[in-house]
Amino acid sequence: MFKGSIVALITPMNEEGEICHSSLKKLIDYHVLNKTKAIVSIGTTGESATLSQEEHIEVVMLTLKLANKRIPIIAGTGANATTEAISLTKRFEKSGIEACLTVTPYYNKPTQEGLYQHFKAISENTKLPQILYNVPSRTGCDLLPSTVARLSEFKNIIGIKEATGDLSRIHKIKKLVKDDFLLISGDDPTALDFIQLGGQGVISVTANIAAKEMTQMCSYALEGNFKSARSINERLMLLHESLFIEPNPIPIKWLAKKIGLIKSDTLRLPMTPILNSTRTQIEKALQYANLQKI
C-alpha cells in the first residue's frame, strides 16, 4: 500500500503560534509536485505533543482538504491513553485518510503485554488501517519484534514505522511476520540500508525540504539500483544527521523557513528556537546536499 518516500510533515505556524494555512498549502503542493508517496499529518515532526486534540483534528482535516485526493494522507492518532487513541482514530474513520500512524504510549512505559493490549484495543475499535510506530528514544518504551508479530495477526494492522535506527530489527521482524506486512524506516540516516534489507520505504523528516531527492533515492533502492540510490544518499547524509542535532522538528522547521517553504519557524514551548551553532552546521550540510531549488 505504501512504498517509497513518505514525508513526516511539519505543522507550519504563524508568529502567534496559530496554524498557517497558506504555508501548509505550499508544503502539500511541493510534495505533490515532487511525487512524495504519502503525507503523515501530525506525527512527531508535526508537533502532535503540543497541539490540542481540536487542533490535531483541524490540521488533519485541513491537510485532506488542501491535498484534495492528490496524495494519500496518513493521520497520526497515537496517545498514551488507549481510550484517547481510540477516540482520535474513530474521528477520522469517514474522513478520507488512507491509514493511521499509532505511536507506542509514551511516558507511562507499559509492558509488552500492555503494548499488545493497547494496539489490540485500537484495532478492534476501527476499520482503518493501522501502522504501528516504534520510537523508544521519544516514548521510553520499545515495541519488540515478538510483540509486533502478535499484532500483525490483526487484519487492519498493516505495518510498522521502525525508528530505532537498529538495522538488526528488520531481520528479526521479517522472520516473524507475513510478506505483506509493511516495514517502513523512521530514521533517515539508515533508511537506505533499511530498504536494502527488505523495507518498503521511509517516513522521512529530510523529505520536508528534499522531496525530489528522497523520492528518487527510494525509487532507485526499491528498483534494486543501489548505486544510484547511494549516490543521492551520500549527498544527503550530512543533512540527515544535522537535522537531529537538536530535537526534531526544531532544525527542519528552521530550514524549511530558510529555503522559503514556510513563512515562520515558530514552535510551541517547550520547544525553543534553533541555536546559532546548529544553523551553521545545517547550512554546511545544505550546501553539500546541492538540493533542487524550490
Curated annotation (Swiss-Prot):
SMART domains, per database record: DHDPS
PROSITE patterns cross-referenced by the UniProt entry: DHDPS_1 (PS00665), DHDPS_2 (PS00666)
Keyword Amino-acid biosynthesis: yes
EC number: 4.3.3.7
Annotated protein name in UniProt: 4-hydroxy-tetrahydrodipicolinate synthase
Enzyme class name: lyase
Gene: dapA
Record-level GO BP terms: diaminopimelate biosynthetic process; lysine biosynthetic process via diaminopimelate
Function: Catalyzes the condensation of (S)-aspartate-beta-semialdehyde [(S)-ASA] and pyruvate to 4-hydroxy-tetrahydrodipicolinate (HTPA).
Annotated positions for site Part of a proton relay during catalysis: 44, 107
Cleavable signal peptide: none
Keywords, alphabetical: Amino-acid biosynthesis, Cytoplasm, Diaminopimelate biosynthesis, Lyase, Lysine biosynthesis, Schiff base
Family affiliation: Belongs to the DapA family.
Assembly mode: Homotetramer; dimer of dimers.
An example Gene Ontology CC term for this record: cytosol
Organism of origin: Buchnera aphidicola subsp. Schizaphis graminum (strain Sg)
